[in-house]
């Protein structure tokens, strides 16, 4: 996996190779190149490369103005405090990253995600496609048909441990639009290294949608540097 990130006049390369046995090799480099458009390409030398087209994307930063959602004492009640709206056009992928804090009272007192039509809450054209919680539970709205059978997971099982692990967990949520479908993958990595992965998909059509986060006796600190909208290189 090679990432090329441009910041001002600089370009930063990070190359991560993961061997079949799990060994990871990471190489980094940066250089001043100015601000003109550049091209990148790969070359083989007594080697052979098979491209993973689905993993080849060009991304732009998502605008994050609200960097903290809720209050640090996790006292914000349900549906009172929200993140910014993040638009997701058809064919693109939104990535959101943040640090999760919880009251620990319930399995649901963590991050919550809503995908809705392209209007503000309470607007005349506002309707929800679905709301998804961190504890493998969700519900639908008027915009499309929700299907709980489409939820899957890895790493869940002990709810007492889950509640403890979600305090300070690093969370990455990816919303990928492919055709009429949207695919959600949420990965929470606890301080002790435990990983919880939650997946969901649903048919939502091809109109513009918005996503936003909600707290419920929880508190989220956005990682703005890792919030972005990605477009496929290979259409």
What are these language model-derived features?
Residues 11-13, 56, 64, 137-138, ...:
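Hydrophobic residues embedded in beta-strands of well-ordered beta-sheets
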Residues 14-18, 45, 114-118, 185-191, ...:
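Predominantly extracellular/luminal cell-surface or secreted proteins
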Residues 2-6, 42, 122-137, 171-177, ...:
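Broad, structure-driven detector of short, well-ordered beta-strand segments within folded domains
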Residues 25-57, 195-229:
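Flexible glycan-contacting loops in extracellular carbohydrate-active proteins
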Residues 2-32, 96, 165-200:
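Carbohydrate-binding surfaces in secreted/extracellular proteins
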Residues 38, 69-147:
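Secretory/extracellular carbohydrate-interaction modules
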Residues 1-3, 146-172:
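Short, aromatic/His-centered strand-loop micro-motif at the edge of beta-sheets
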Residues 55-74, 230-235:
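Low-complexity, Pro/Thr/Ser/Gly/Ala-rich linker/spacer regions in secreted
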């Amino acid at each position: 996996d090679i990432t090329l990130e441009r910041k001002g006049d600089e370009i930063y390369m990070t190359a991560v190779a993961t061997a079949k046995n799990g060994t990871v090799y990471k190489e980094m480099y940066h250089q001043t190149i100015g601000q003109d458009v550049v091209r990148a390409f790969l070359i083989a030398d007594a080697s052979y490369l098979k491209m993973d087209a689905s993993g080849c994307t060009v991304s732009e930063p998502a605008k994050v103005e609200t960097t903290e959602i809720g209050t640090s004492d996790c006292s914000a009640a349900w549906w009172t405090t929200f993140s910014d709206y993040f638009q997701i056009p058809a064919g693109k992928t939104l990535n959101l990253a943040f640090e999760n804090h919880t009251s620990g009272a319930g399995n649901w007192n963590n991050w919550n995600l809503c995908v809705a039509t392209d209007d503000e809450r309470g607007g005349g054209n506002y309707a929800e496609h679905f709301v998804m919680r961190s504890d493998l539970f969700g519900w639908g709205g008027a915009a499309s048909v929700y299907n709980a059978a489409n939820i899957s997971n890895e790493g869940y099982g002990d709810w007492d441990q889950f509640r403890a692990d979600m305090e300070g967990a690093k969370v990455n949520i990816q919303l990928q639009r492919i055709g009429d479908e949207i695919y959600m993958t949420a990965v929470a990595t606890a301080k002790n290294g435990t990983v919880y992965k939650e997946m969901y998909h649903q048919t939502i059509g091809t109109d513009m949608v918005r996503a936003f986060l909600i707290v419920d006796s929880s508190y989220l600190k956005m990682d703005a540097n890792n919030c972005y909208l990605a477009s496929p290189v290979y259409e």
